């Protein structure tokens, strides 16, 4: 199945010069959405994954069904102030400055094998911060999976030492 047929490209959104890749049409089509989830779960099935981790918000949309498909748990990565218990955090660089991500300090146990799932690999900042938190907690990043990679933004560099899968590529 060619999943690129289920991605809407919106030019000049959210600002001039940017083409936003909208996954809403993919999610609206049950067959395409299921296919994408199964493809990521298939990638993970031989990696002895203990936990799926996904950054808000679209990492939840993709990561939770992958976790269900694998029969394992899901741990959310959130912006500061959104999680009610003790957290670990990591800063990452965005095009307009620093930002921070957090996850519960008890979300990953030492030695657990983790799959990071998100909708988009762009610059790699989000996944790099997520990896930092998982490893700070003693987890092992067994793989990363993304629906889309924006090729020109060099996000692969951030995960060059990790196994990963990308379902679709678009220009950055």
UniProtKB/Swiss-Prot annotation:
The keyword Aminoacyl-tRNA synthetase does not apply. One of its GO terms (cellular component) is cytoplasm. It catalyses: AMP + diphosphate = 5-phospho-alpha-D-ribose 1-diphosphate + adenine. It is an enzyme of class 2 (transferase). Pathway: Purine metabolism; AMP biosynthesis via salvage pathway; AMP from adenine: step 1/1. It is found in: Cytoplasm. Its EC number is 2.4.2.7. Pfam families: Pribosyltran. GO terms for molecular function: adenine binding; adenine phosphoribosyltransferase activity; AMP binding. InterPro entries: Ade_phspho_trans, PRibTrfase_dom, PRTase-like, UPRTase/APRTase. PANTHER family: ADENINE PHOSPHORIBOSYLTRANSFERASE. Belongs to the purine/pyrimidine phosphoribosyltransferase family. Homodimer. This is Adenine phosphoribosyltransferase.
